[in-house]
Amino acid sequence: MDISGHPKTRTRTIFDEVDEPVWFCCVLPIWVGEEMASGWGITGNKGRCYDFWMDFSECMSHCREPKDCTLLREDYLECLHHSKEFQRRNRIYKEEQRKLRAASRKGEEAGDGTHNHH
């Protein structure tokens, strides 16, 4: 398969004996500390969780113990991952399914005993 015209391939590499093209990839830098949440979102505006991060970060820089910032940490993580929201939706879905199964079982039981013979 010849893909030498592909914009991400090089025709000559230091490994010229290898038949496969070399693919470039983008590596996103990972910063530690303040740079980790710079405030810039993917659209160029402020990120959706930046305010939560700033509140949590400020609390951590002024608190005596990390447990003092537990609620702010939970808010920040919920903004990032939506885990509590997904758990709630899952509980609602399971309850709806349970009610549907119970209604169908009740309908089957009622249908078994009522045969009309004319």
Curated annotation (Swiss-Prot):
Membrane topology, as annotated: Peripheral membrane protein
Motif extent (Cx9C motif 1): 49-59
GO CC annotation: mitochondrial inner membrane; mitochondrial intermembrane space; mitochondrial membrane; mitochondrion; respiratory chain complex I
A biological-process GO annotation: photorespiration
Subcellular location: Mitochondrion; Mitochondrion inner membrane; Mitochondrion intermembrane space
Motif Cx9C motif 2: positions: 69-79
Disulfide bridge positions per record: C49-C79, C59-C69
Keywords, in A-Z order: Disulfide bond, Electron transport, Membrane, Mitochondrion, Mitochondrion inner membrane, Respiratory chain, Transport
Residue ranges, annotated region (Disordered): 98-118
Keyword check for Mitochondrion: yes
Annotated ranges, domain CHCH: 46-87
Superkingdom, natural source: Eukaryota
Subunit structure: Complex I is composed of at least 49 different subunits. This is a component of the iron-sulfur (IP) fragment of the enzyme.
Job description of the protein: Accessory subunit of the mitochondrial membrane respiratory chain NADH dehydrogenase (Complex I), that is believed not to be involved in catalysis. Complex I functions in the transfer of electrons from NADH to the respiratory chain. The immediate electron acceptor for the enzyme is believed to be ubiquinone.
Domain notes: Contains two C-X9-C motifs that are predicted to form a helix-coil-helix structure, permitting the formation of intramolecular disulfide bonds.
Family, as annotated: Belongs to the complex I NDUFS5 subunit family.
Protein name: NADH dehydrogenase [ubiquinone] iron-sulfur protein 5-A
